[in-house]
Amino acid sequence: MKNWRTLILGLALSASTAFAAPQVVDKVAAVVDNSVVLESDVNSLLQSVKLNAQQAGQQLPDDATLRHQITDRLIMDNIILQMAQKMGIQVTDEQLDQAITNIAAQNRMSIDQLKSQLANEGLNYNTYRSQIRKEMLISEVRNNEVRRRVTVLPQEVDTLAKQIANQTGENDELNLSHILLPLPENPTQQQVDEAENLATSLVKQISEGADFGKLAITYSSDSQALKGGQMGWGKLQEIPTLFAERLTQVQKGQVVGPIRSGVGFHILKVNDIRGGNKSVSVTETHARHILIKPSVVMTDSQAQAKLADVAQQIKNGSTDFAAQAKLLSQDPGSANQGGDLGWASPDMYDPAFRDALLKLKKGEISQPIHSSFGWHLIQLLDTRQVDKTDAAQKEQAYRMIFNRKFAEEAQTWMQEQRAAAYVKVINGATN
C-alpha cells in the first residue's frame, strides 16, 4: 500500500546516496542486466532503514540479513527503472515539484520547512528529489504493466455492491502486516517443504512473542518487507481473496497462516480492525442564473454592470428573475426556462460559479459572478440531501475488486520480472 505521495520524511526506501557522506572508491554490489547496484547504494539504504527503525522502535535483524534484503530490493528497483528507460517513461520537473508539494502538505509543512527537516536528518534536497523521481518512475511502470492484467466484470461489481449493502455495522477494514516466503516457478517438493516448515516456525515464534516486524525484515520477499511488512489499512474486499477467506472472523492481534499461494507462503498479522460508514448522501442545489457573455458590443465591465442593475431591479420588485433570464440570458440550455438549472450537484458547475452558489442562502441572489463562460447572476432556490449510497457502493465495489486483483497480479508480475532478468550478486551468487 505504499504510495510515493505519502512518503514520510527521512525515508525514501529506494534511496541511493541519501546520506551525503564522503565516498571512497565505489564497488559494484550486483550486476542487473545492463546496469549495476553500487555498494554505496546498499550502504545508504542500510543507514536509512536503521535510522527509521530506531525512530519507530522497530527491531532489526543482523546486518548480513538486512544487507541481503536491501540488495534484493535495490535489484528489483533497478530492473523496473531500466524498464522505464526502455519505455520512454519520464517524470517532468513539474510533476516532481507537485509530488514533493503534496508530501510537504501531508506532513503539514511548507517546502522550506521540508528542506530544513531534510537537512536536519542529513539528507541533501537534490538527492531527495532524485529519489522521489525514482519512486514515481517505479510506480508508473508497475501501475501501467499490472493494470493491463486486471479485468473487473460488471457482474462482479454488482454482486459485491449487494454484499456491501447488506453489511450492517461489521468491522470490515483491517490494518495488516505481511510476510511472504517465496517459491520459485515449478518448485520441487523439497523447496515447498522447506518454505512451509520455515513459515510454520515463524508463526510459532510470533505466537511466543517474537517481533513480527523484525521477522518480516529478515525473511519476507514482499515489497513492504523493509517497513516491517506493514501493509496499512484496507477493506476486506480489497485484500486478495485467498487472504480474505481467512480474515472474516479475526480479532485484533491475531496471526493468520501459513497460507499457500501461487507465489509462496504468507503470514498475516491483524494489527487493528475498524468499521466504515455505509450511508452516503450528497447535497444537491436547485438554482437559476442569468448569463451575459462579453462581446464586441458589450465589454466585460458593461456586462458586470448590466447584471448588477438587473439584480437591483429584482430586489426592488420591479421585475422578476425568470423574466429577465428569458430576456437577457445567453445560456441556451436554461434561458427559455427562466434560467432554471434544475437539481444538480454543485461540483458539476464551473468552480467560480460553484463557490458563489454554495455561499448563498435559500432565495438569495448573488452579486455578478465571473466564470470561464462570462458573467452570471445566480439565485439559490433550494437545497436537498440525496442518498447516493447505491452509486457509492458500486464505485466502492469496483475499487475494492480492482485493488484486490491488482495486489494479486503485482506480486506475480514482480516475480516474473525478477526471474527474467540477468542478476549477479558480486559475492558469488548468480540468478
Swiss-Prot record:
Enzyme Commission number(s) of this protein: 5.2.1.8
Keyword Signal: yes
Predominant place of localization: periplasm
GO molecular function term, any single one: peptide binding
Main EC class the enzyme belongs to: isomerase
Transmembrane region(s): none
Cross-referenced PROSITE patterns: PPIC_PPIASE_1, PPIC_PPIASE_2
Superkingdom assignment: Bacteria
A single cellular component GO annotation: outer membrane-bounded periplasmic space
Location in or out of the cell: Periplasm
Record field: catalytic activity: [protein]-peptidylproline (omega=180) = [protein]-peptidylproline (omega=0)
GO biological process: Gram-negative-bacterium-type cell outer membrane assembly; protein folding; protein stabilization
UniProt keywords, alphabetically: Chaperone, Isomerase, Periplasm, Repeat, Rotamase, Signal
A Pfam cross-reference name: Rotamase
Leader sequence segment: 1-20
Function text: Chaperone involved in the correct folding and assembly of outer membrane proteins. Recognizes specific patterns of aromatic residues and the orientation of their side chains, which are found more frequently in integral outer membrane proteins. May act in both early periplasmic and late outer membrane-associated steps of protein maturation.
UniProt xrefs under PANTHER family: CHAPERONE SURA
Domain notes for this protein: The PPIase activity resides only in the second parvulin domain. The N-terminal region and the C-terminal tail are necessary and sufficient for the chaperone activity of SurA. The PPIase activity is dispensable for SurA to function as a chaperone. The N-terminal region and the C-terminal tail are also required for porin recognition.
Name the UniProt record assigns to this protein: Chaperone SurA
Organism (species): Pectobacterium atrosepticum (strain SCRI 1043 / ATCC BAA-672)
Gene label: surA
